[in-house]
């Protein structure tokens, strides 16, 4: 009896843990997890020189606004549960450019740069990191996408100064900012930010990223070195964000399109302006 009860509890726990990807990825899949986005946003403070002096000053004065802004494009994931369509376009270049263009103080500038950094590093994820792991692991796009990005979150988490959920709900400033820039009510903004922070916190407490990373290291002996490789590839190309901050619109997509669409889009974009260089010699 006790063994049957334990088995049933394990089954229920597994079902609960795997329901997290199902909930968060019910719509369009995005890319890197929030922890990974916050890590790359951190680099803009001291490791990556921003050419615009106003933006450079802004991110150094308000690093927490920068890192909170790096979470905002993923509001697209919670728009339906927050009962608003205001965030349908939150993961698009034109939205991030509009946020930057409307910034009138250093806090707003830092937040907009964070949102831009989210989209910029997603280009690497969608066109290199995720396809590589769909090829190396298993070709189940939604599941592989979630597993790879959350394993990366675990791999990179020790380098974070603060967790994404804490920065999303640090004060009321972010909710006010979101309401203004996404043209929604303050109540809808607070609800969406709270739900995104709650989903992120639930994911961390579930220990699913750690489980995926641990299983991945057992089944894929080169996982750690490959993840370090992709971190280095993104870091090396991060200074190219200056071109986007200067108004350039990259040809590559920040959203995750169907595989056939992505492949068709990548061919004509190869070697064009506004495109981060493809990582050379991707390890397998």
Locate the predicted segments by residue.
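N-terminal leader/auxiliary helical segments
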Residues: 2-6, 10-114, 120-284
